[in-house]
Each structure stands twice: as C-alpha cells, then as structure tokens.
Amino acid sequence: DPSLNDYTAKILADNKKCGSHDFLYRGLAHMWGADWSNISAKGMLDMDKELEDFINDEKDPGDFENYLIVPPFSQAEILKRTFEPLFSEVKLNTRVTEINYGSKEIIVKDQLGQSHSADAVIITIPLAILKKGTVKFTPTLPQKKREAIEKLQMTPGGKVFIKFKKNLWGDTWSFQNDGFIVMYLITGYHQEPEKNTVVEGFVMGQEAEIFVKASKEKQRELLKQDLQAFFGAEAFEENYEDHFYFGWESQEDIGGAYSFPSVADAADCRKALRETVDKKLYFAGEATDCNGYSQTVSGALYSGKRAAEELMKDFE
C-alpha cells in the first residue's frame, strides 16, 4: 500500500521526469488534511471514484451553482436559519462521557453527572475523539467498527489567514508553490477587489506541528518566504497587516483537522464506521461519508441527514 509520496516518486521515475512538481502532490495532500507520506494512494483514488459515482450528471455536478456562499453569510448562519426551531434544544458545553446501550433504553451520561435516556442515539463524535476513547461505550463497540476507528487517521491541521492592506494578486484565486505551505487560496475571491485582501493557507501534518509551536514572528517569516515568490518581498513587507492561525487540534473535543485515507481499504473502514449498531447507535460525521465528500462540511451535513433517515426508517 504505497503512500502518495512513494506513488508520486514511482510515477516520476517510470516516466523519467524530475521531481520539480512534487510540491503539487504535497499540496494535494495538505488539502486532504495530512502529510503526503501518511496518505494511501489507493485510498485517495478510491475516494475520487466515490465522488465520480455520486456525481454522475456532467451538466449539473451537485447543483453547486445554487449554493454559492459568500460573506457575510457563514455556514453557521445558514444552519441557524434552516434549523432555527431546533437550536433551543441544543445543549452546549456538555461533554458526553459514556453511552450505555446494553439495555432497551440507552443511557447517555455527561460531564455534569447527568443521565439522559433515549431509544436511539445519533453519534457525531469526531474520529480523533473516538480514537482517544474518552467516550466510554457499554458494551464496547463491535470489533469491525473498532478496527475502522483504529485504521482511519485524523492528524493536526488548520488554516492561516493573512490580511494585507490591499489586493496584490488581482483576480487570481489560488497560489501553489514548493514552500512551507504549498496551497494558498484567496478567501475573498467572490468579493470586490477592494474587499479581497485576505489569503488563506492550508497548514497540515508536519507543517501544522511546526507552525503551531512557532512564535508569531517566526510564523510571519515562514509566510513571507512563501508569498514573496508571488508578489515580492518588498510588497509583502509594505502591505502585510496581520495573520491568524487556527488549528483544530487545539480544540479538546475535536482533536484534528479531518479524516483522511490513511490505508488502502479506507473506503471499507468508513462504511464500517457508519454502520448502525443494534438499531440503537447511528453514526454520522465527515469520516462516515462514502460519497467522496468526507473531510468537508458538505459531507458532514449529508451524513447527518443519512443517519437521521436510517433512524426514522427503523422506527416507522
């Protein structure tokens, strides 16, 4: 099961090409939330195939043109507007510590020591937290599901946002370079030029571990080394205002960026992870998506819809 790194090296060697474009594959890995040495080439190709199978209408690939989201509307705002009646039922800052599904009635315990009963539970716990085992399942989850949790990976990662005094890139929407951060996107691409002044960089895997430990000045220097290749060191110095990094690994209840295909049978692992247990436990979350949208908010939302539909069908 070769990694994306090994696979790329073999392809280049077989075609007698130099590795000058290796960074493109490394950047692809960063978008997938990991270092390219940790991504299974087969697992990644299988996910691409899933997406092709799911979107089989070339003229209308997923109706994306109907769902363009631009500021000031965030994804959170869209959720609030769509599901506003349910928000009063959401209990925040209440971490679940145990799920006992050994009897007909399921008992869910939280960090405050309170117990909640239900006939069924939809579980959206992030993969990294499932791997830590901080939520106790009684009885233990089926072996196939535990093996899937062990095989799938979710490592540190996040995004850095760099604000400039003015737009230095015109209508360009992305930068790719063989630097510390390979992939940069323009967050204000759909905005007017005068509002389009922020660049977003994917910081994943080893780079995320380095970046989060660096001082802000050292982070700024790393960003300068990358971005000066596109609009020069002087322009960077004259127009840089500030930058902000957010890594999901810093969030105690999330623990990482998002899942990625770390093994050749990653698709089978995601199918095992999403399987219902005894018509009691229903699993959702981006890591359970099998339509090529794992690692995305879209995949997470779709998985929640799928789990809810499975539950309703079982309780008809």
Q: Which residues make up each language-model segment?
A:
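FAD-dinucleotide binding site
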Residues: 1-316
